[in-house]
A protein has these predicted regions:
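Aromatic-residue-lined binding/catalytic grooves and analogous aromatic/hydrophobic interfacial grooves
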Residues: 1-425, 446, 532, 539-575, ...
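Alpha-helical scaffolds flanking conserved acidic
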Residues: 322-326, 458-463, 619-623
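C-terminal capping/lid segments that line or modulate ligand- or cofactor-binding pockets
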Residues: 26-49, 53-54, 105, 359-382, ...
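The feature captures the catalytic groove of carbohydrate-active enzymes
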Residues: 253, 258-263, 347-360, 408-459, ...
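Asparagine-centered strand-capping/turn motif at beta-strand->loop junctions
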Residues: 165, 739-743
Length: 797
């Protein structure tokens, strides 16, 4: 049933389904700039083409100053008018006619391949090679095997598509390019709309040329060159007809934000210069593409299915197999590699709707799911274009802070208006959620810890954190009695305190823990970066004093972390949202992370997990599993991960946002969205199950789930650029750990539960078996330290 060579191949035996939303089940690939979504039909094949920079609709505006209304937020809180308090700024912005709209990714076009079929096809399959990104569709018609292969070249920035057969019956089909299908134009509210885009297609020599005019007046389109080996090719005004060819190669390039007359000629010339054949182009591309995939390895020894459809059936009927979880890790990396260019959209480069639901990236949590696994996966540099965009919008973020809250520093909205940093919506969930900047700061600081890129910190990173720190310095006020900070109003997404009217739905409260942990992270990072940059002593001291004023996190009467340091608002532990778990919820350990606090986090998250069935969406479960993995509770994380995969995986392994099948685990969503962030987030979960770090502190798993009997995690990158390889065998109770640092350093190592002994350490006195720790473990520059750790056997067979 299982072939080791197929480990990096996802094979399906059915084409995309889903009726008029078939694109949601397509097989996808791309190069970060262009992407294709292959529906996989034998007779009428549709391949949807997307470009990273093609958007439509959306508008910004001039953000008015409504900071004079902030005082009304506190007044309404004091009078228990919570809903009124939450909507103060929203109403003020609406009154001044600030009505921004987020834009939508716009599909460039569809490739249409119509093939005569003489009988019901047999031996059908479609597959993705995760190492190369190549998508294949294979079938037999009257005994003759037909093969179609496509990838998006990183070498030539070209879509490369080949059709061939290996029998007496040759390749025959019609090919054209069309405007993306408009029959399913619906919003999330099931409202129909007219697309009203002017598009045209024509043939020109060996080319099919498709062009369209966007709503901003710019042109977009696609130029495809058709190359036949044998057979007869004829053309009409808008399509090519190929009969009895040995093989056909189609090369295509797209353009956006251009003028079509000039761009079409340029692309025709570029396509004519590409050197064939297909295999040569694929080899050149794979050398570049595989670097995204092979930089880290997760190997989980298990029985496996070559057929993903069977693996999914088994998953739905029972539990996810270990091999499926391993493939989900690879698939997440594939989606990242195919989508990551200067930015990533929630729909990747695979969108098939004109107004795709939730297709605008959210800077809060979603962005971190898309990128944060890359820090440990040797892909840290991929986040730099994202940081550049945030830095370019710094002036807008300052306007946001001043005009909304009357504060210094910056405010980053979770949703941004097109081509700027202003809020993209005025709903309270965007306007009141002012902790987004701390999430970006966590990414910046994590990038620094894993790359030691001090030049970036000097030029951009420190200023960004400093501006965020200034916001919290202004926003938080010192209690004269306790000498610690208070916060008169805040927003804890997306939870309503448990002690209010059951019919009320709001997230505003005072002394929200998410405010304090966010400010604490920023102040702490500023202190550390101040030392690294040799900042003035008074400046470092200022941030340290602010850090010292952050109040301790409180625990409720049941022993779980409170969401509010308040006697007015009570924590709702029946909610699946965990904003007070920052930064663990995005896979990052703060510098002051302690095992006792991590135990509190694990217990709190697991309690919420047990009490929230029926309320989950896939994002909740992804964040819970990430949090548990980051604090070392790999067993708990694995349980949540299995629930996520079992209940939200669709037929092409994309995780749906909601429970559209109504199985009872999640909140029912009839119009669930296609988003790749949860798939990529799985990579973060699985990596963090094995090992985590916080500066010079390295933490191994407390215990691994019994299902992961044997395996390895190779070439993971920790803080201080330390590389780590792990091999584990639960039955034997053995963990082999290799650490390699680029410079002389010492680290502290937290050991697994049930620790017995360790080999490979020169000084046994640094081992504290009782507290499961090793202190002052020396690493010599560019030399591998090999350790063999023995722990209690956690499985019996």
């Amino acid at each position: 049933m299982y072939n080791k060579k197929s480990k990096n191949v996802l094979k399906f035996v059915t084409p995309a389904g889903g009726f008029d939303a078939r694109w949601r089940e397509g097989l996808v690939t791309g190069n970060g700039s262009m992407g294709v979504n292959v529906l996989g039909s034998a007779g009428r094949e549709v391949i949807i083409v997307n470009h990273a920079d093609l958007f439509w609709q959306g508008k910004a505006g001039v953000l008015p100053d409504v900071s004079d209304k902030v005082k009304n937020i506190v007044k309404n809180l004091d009078t228990l008018s919570y809903k009124d308090a939450e909507t103060v700024l929203t109403n003020a912005l609406n009154a001044k006619n600030y009505k921004p709209e987020c834009n939508y990714p716009l599909p460039v076009c569809d490739f249409l391949i119509t093939t005569p079929i003489e009988n019901s096809v047999t031996e059908y399959s479609r597959s993705i090679n995760l190492e190369s990104g190549e998508v294949k569709v294979n079938y037999r018609d009257r005994g003759v095997k037909f093969d179609r292969s496509i990838f998006v070249s990183r070498q030539n920035n070209t879509i490369v598509y080949e059709l061939s057969s290996n029998g007496s019956k040759k390749v025959s089909f019609d090919f054209t390019i069309s405007m993306h299908d408009t029959t399913n134009n619906r919003t999330a509210n099931f409202e129909n709309f007219d697309v009203n885009l002017n598009c045209s297609v024509k043939t020109d020599k060996d080319f099919v040329v498709f062009t369209g005019r966007n709503d901003d007046g710019t042109d977009f389109g696609c130029v495809a060159k058709v190359i036949c080996s044998g057979g007869v090719i004829t053309k009409t005004i808008d399509k090519f007809s190929i009969k009895n060819a040995d093989r056909v190669l189609i090369l295509a390039k797209t353009f956006v934000l251009s003028q079509k007359d000039k761009k079409v000629m340029e692309l025709q010339e570029e396509l004519s210069l590409i050197k064939l054949p297909y295999d040569k182009l694929l080899k050149e591309h794979t050398i570049l593409h595989s670097k995204f995939i092979n930089n880290t390895e997760i190997n989980l020894v298990s029985e496996a299915y070559d057929n993903i459809n069977l693996a999914l059936l088994n998953c739905k009927a029972n539990e996810p197999s270990v091999s499926l979880i391993e493939k989900m890790y690879m698939y997440g990396k594939h989606l990242f590699a195919c989508s990551c260019g200067n930015k990533i959209n929630p729909t990747g480069l695979f969108n098939g709707d004109y107004k795709a639901y939730r297709s605008t990236v959210e800077n809060y949590l979603q962005l971190q799911r898309l990128y944060n696994f890359g820090f440990k996966a040797s892909l840290s540099k991929q986040v730099l274009p994202l940081f550049d965009r945030f830095y370019e919008n710094l002036d807008d973020y300052k306007k946001n802070s001043t005009r909304l809250y009357g504060c210094k520093g910056i405010y980053i909205p979770s949703l941004e208006a097109p081509e700027c940093g202003l809020p993209g919506s005025t709903v309270p969930g965007v306007i009141m959620n002012y902790n987004v900047a701390s999430y970006i700061c966590a990414m910046i600081y994590q990038y620094y810890l894993q790359t030691d890129d001090i030049d970036f910190i000097k030029e951009k990173g420190y200023e960004f954190l400093e501006e965020t720190g200034l916001f919290y310095e202004d926003k938080l006020k010192e209690n004269k009695t306790t000498k610690t900070f208070e916060c008169a109003y805040g927003y804890s997404p997306f939870n309503t305190p448990s002690n209010v009217n059951a019919n009320e739905d709001f997230c505003i409260a005072s002394n929200c823990v998410c405010d304090f942990v966010s400010a604490s992270f920023v102040f702490s990072a500023l202190v550390q970066l101040g030392f690294a940059l040799n900042k003035d002593e008074k400046e470092v001291e200022k941030w340290q004093k602010l850090l010292d004023k952050i109040p301790d996190v409180e625990v409720d009467r049941d022993g779980y972390i409170k969401e509010y340091n308040s006697n007015v608002f009570e924590t709702n532990n029946a909610s699946p949202y965990i904003p007070h778990m920052f930064p663990y919820n995005i896979g990052i350990k703060p510098l002051d992370s302690r095992r006792d606090y991590e135990d509190l986090i694990a217990n709190t998250v697991k309690y919420r997990y047990k009490n929230c069935f029926g309320k989950f969406n896939s994002a909740n479960l992804c964040d819970m599993a990430t949090t548990l993995a980051t604090v070392g509770d790999s067993v708990g994380s694995y349980e949540v991960l299995c629930t996520l995969i079992k209940n939200f995986t669709t037929n092409n392994l994309i995780l749906s946002s909601g429970d559209n099948t109504g199985m009872g685990v999640g909140a029912y969503e009839p119009w669930t969205s296609f988003e790749i962030d949860k798939n990529i987030g799985i990579c973060n979960i699985i990596q963090n199950m094995f090992i985590n770090s916080s500066k010079n502190n390295i933490s191994l798993f407390r215990a691994l789930p019994k299902e992961l009997k044997k395996g390895s995690a190779l070439n993971l990158v920790l803080d201080n650029q330390i590389k780590a390889d792990l091999e584990f065998n639960l039955k034997k109770g053995v963990l082999k750990l290799k650490l390699k640092s680029p410079k002389n350093t010492s680290v502290n190592l937290n050991l697994p539960n049930g620790f017995k002994k360790i080999k490979g350490i020169a000084d046994p006195n640094i081992v504290d078996a009782k507290n499961l720790s090793i202190t002052g473990l020396s690493l010599q520059a560019n030399k591998i330290l090999s350790l063999k750790i023995y722990f209690a056997n956690t499985i019996n067979n």
